[in-house]
Amino acid sequence: MSNVLGFGAVGDGVADDTEALQHTLDAGDGVLRLNKGTYRITRPLVLDLTKQGIGAVRGEGGTSRIIMAGPGPAIRVIGDHQGTASPVTVQAHTWKNERFPTIRGIEIVGEHPDSVGIELRKTMKCVISQVLIRRCRIAIQLVERNRDFLLADSHLYDNHEIGLLLDRCNLHQIIVHGCHISWNKVAGIKSLGGDVHNLQIVGNDIEYNNATSGGAIVSPADLAKHPGGAEIWFDATDGTISEVTISGNTIQATVQTGGANIRIEGVPVVRPERADTPKTQTWDTAHLINITGNVLGSQWRGLDLRHVSRVTITGNTIYDSSDLSIFATHCSGIVVSGNTFSWRGLDSEITKDGLRFEDCDNIILSSLSTMRLCAGSAEAGAAVTFIRCSDCGVSDCQILDPLHRGLELEDCLRCRIANNTIVDRREKPSMRHAIRVLGQSRSNLVSGNILGGATVKLIDATGEASELRDNMLLR
């Protein structure tokens, strides 16, 4: 283990220790041990595993600080892993010289506006733990190709743009757990393009990740290309993301217009069709995602989903979404079950919360507990709104005290609204309709609901829009 003081480092936060630290990496045994102190550097420290062999960076239990006063990453780890996670694809030189680099026990502070904390390139089984990275543009950036990455027990805090960035990276088998990822000005965790699969984000506190939080040194105008910040943001408009679990996190906590607690963006994909491909089959670049057991709230939107499929949203507490709790457009195969929404305690509070689905199919809402959802207006929209959707179901939900309407279908086909309670219990009700079906809607079923408290009409569905039966209408 190479002691940096023996290679000429000063560690007083004033002297430029770049040469001494790099000399330690190049001439030492591959393990960079940072004694207690503050090490100022002006260019990246490169741990090139292809040249130096197996390596690591270790601090003294969090007492070791690196100040990055130049552009680029404070620590750059380079490997040459060219395969996947499958053992048969891992080349001998990876196991011999490059596997399992670890970085732990250090703080990295950015002084340059283009500084990055840690960059990983073509690594295999890298583990970053017990680190604090702050005031960098990006805290941790993965590029090109990486496999089996673990980030644990760390703080990515108050960075100018992003906490953890998966940057156009071919990346599988990623676990992020036990971390505090907060006060980053664009996103807490962002996947941008690339080919990302098998991502688990579990047991973290992910908060205040937008330009309005924490006294951003980059003005919101300079971040105009980033729509409002997000705690978790998957952008697969030029790539793919799938097989994702987001579970047991706190994901909140300040509103920026255009922002979201979780934003997932895909695009439709055209694939060669086999003879037996169903005509209704659609493909997209963001799919197979599980969002379970989280607390999400205090943002413009809770979840913002675009061109996403096969998503399960269960057992979450979702609250204080100033625009919408869930917005989904051009999505398919979405299950929203067993969640609670809202709790706008006072009529004097700003209007907020609601669910809206546009141009979607195969959506299921079930066993939801909602109260005082405000989405829509006196003219259009409801607490739960479907527009141009088909083959959707809403069942066994409590939609209590909605501001304008309980549920609205517009231009919808073959949707089923069954066994829900939609009532306005206020002394002076404001709900105009419990259920309204309009436009070119057809072949929809409204059955077995308990409806009450509407100021205009409990069910407004005319013509061939719906079959109505066995509903309890409370006068």
Where are these regions (language model features)?
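Parallel beta-helix/beta-solenoid
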Residues: 29, 49-52, 56-60, 70, 77-136, 202, 245-251, ...
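N-terminal extracellular ligand-recognition/capping segment immediately after the signal peptide
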Residues: 8, 18, 26-72, 80, ...
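Glycine-rich, low-complexity segments
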Residues: 1-5, 414, 468, 474
